[in-house]
Amino acid sequence: MTSYRRRIPQRNRARGSAAGNVITLLLFVGLIALGAYLLLGKKDENGTARSESASAVQRGEPDGDAPAPIEPVDGTPTLEAAATYEPKDNTLQIDISEYAGYGGLIVANGGLEPNPDSFFAKEYGFKVKITQSEHETWSPLNNGRLAATATTTDALAVLGRQFDAVIPLQIGYSRGADMVVVDRGIASVNQLADKVLAASQFNESEFFIRYLAQEAGVPISILRDLDARPEAGHLGLVFYDDAFIACDAYAHELTRSSPRLNGCVGWTPRTDEVVEKSAGKAKALVSNRNLLVIADVLAVNKGFAKAHPDMVRGLVHGILEGNRRLRDQQAQNIGVVAKAFGWSEADARNELSRVHLSNLPENRAFFAGTIDSAGSFGGIFQSSVLSYGSVIKNPTDPARFVDTSFLDALAGKGLFAEQKIAIAPIKTSTNASLEGDPLLSKDIRFFFEPNSAVLDRSAPQNAEYLDTINRFLTVSPGSTVLLRGHVDNARVNEFREQGGEQLVKSMALKAMELSRQRSLAVRDALTEKYKKLDVSRLEAVGRGWEEPASPDSNLNRRVEVQWFTLE
């Protein structure tokens, strides 16, 4: 099995003078002494150390070789100053990580090394040298040390204006490589409130869980160690150097009698291994197999792109051609990908099964926002802005990164004319069963005309709420939504006083029907607004006042949206 890895963000490390280092060392020693005093010297009246860590040691549960959390970066990453990349010997340097999704680039190049027989050399007259790095290469690209690199769309929102790059191409979608693993008893994203997960900062690991939590209405707290607890109702995140190590940390905690982690956000195959070796304590809550919000894109140094547009056009054309060969002729081309990464061909096929390599029409729909079976560039970018919240102080316009002229030029020449958008659900079960637990639930207060099931067309919020529900169905092929209508129970006691339990039962039936009609009105509004939406992916029921969400009657007048995804 391969060791699938994605980028690890570089962390800023301050450099000090020798005197500063001495002072730092003295302060460090002093803090250790103070910590020892607080840990061992301060005891309650029963003589038990107040520190959770100390009590764990006394219970015979030392951390041993458990991975240590990292200090989280406050704010967003800081990149090196922008500079223009200059090709050397007519050869472009491109950096990637060990990921099958970049196989199209490797196929087009005929391997990693500069190749006179590559698609790039034969069709456009330049060569490409592909390097691999375990760390993010945003700074080397920005600073002109790379012509291009691969990153994910969500990261662009975090990097913002300082990232002087052009995005001319979507490489593909991750489909099943990213996964959230949790304690066996956790049934939905909503139930992650007050729990703690291990993750990796500023990559798709963090974005994936932030995206899910934001959609479920669960706020995020960033924790600095395992003994810290999130704010009430929040999901706590503890960061590690990479998502593999985050899963190692969760696996270690599962061996303790009182685990301090409730799960991890990581990458296959490590996530699968954690579940398999947990003795039934852990399970996969969700993967991105049918939740297409992790989209890899090609990032090109902006100064280089402006000076050498023909080379950028060649990169775009070559990667699309490599993607075509891997999609349509995998057997003939998989060997070069396996060799480049040191995989067996069986492992390469397994890794490619977790990737959707994008073609030309899928690219154009991705950037235009018209793709209806996966996340779009603008949609994922804005989801990242919303998910990171206050971390991103001054969000930028996603359009500043995009240049679709290269894709448009290829389409204008009639290239790849036979290709179609072909993103289908990957089914491991017959459908997204409404009998099980939803991935997440979201309460939405649609506005209706008084005492009726007619949506208030004058309320602008209703259109936004419809967009929210449609977004669920768009980014997740094969998923379904259950609309559960609710009304408030404010007058139940009044009905009881007027006519006893008989009147209460009668009015309860009317409330049930009104709530059903309201959920049907939402369903009908969705299918009216989004013509391509399959009505079979929507189900509507009424629950009347049977399931109040709050003592506040206003909050009980709602449509609960339950999202069921295929796994």
Where are these regions (language model features)?
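Second-shell loop/turn segments in exported
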Residues: 92-93, 127-128, 166, 194-200, ...
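Pocket-lining segment of extracytoplasmic ligand-binding domains
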Residues: 153-155, 234-342
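Secondary-structure end/capping motifs
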Residues: 307-394
